[in-house]
Amino acid sequence: LNIKVLKKTSDELRIEIEGEGHTFCNVLQRALLEDETVEMAGYNISHPLVANPVVYVRMKEGRKPEKKPETALREAAAKIKLQTKQFRTSLEKALKEWQQK
């Protein structure tokens, strides 16, 4: 997974994620928007066959605590990782219960 930083300020971050699509970016966007310090999060894929998604994050002005957009991205990635682990655990439990029927 290659990531290229396209723009970085104290309030904004724009990155390009090579080889990803709507599936990953949609999950990332949702996790970012659950952060109260994030004003806007979105992504754009200019052409689904030849373009990489560009993810954009803008933080709220006067946010407390002061958080950088890269910190919000790191926290969103950690949240996605935890949710994936919880999903796997729940799936394994459900499959085991199904087999015992």
Task: Give names to the regions the model predicted.
Residues L1-K101:
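Protein-protein interaction/assembly regions in multi-subunit complexes
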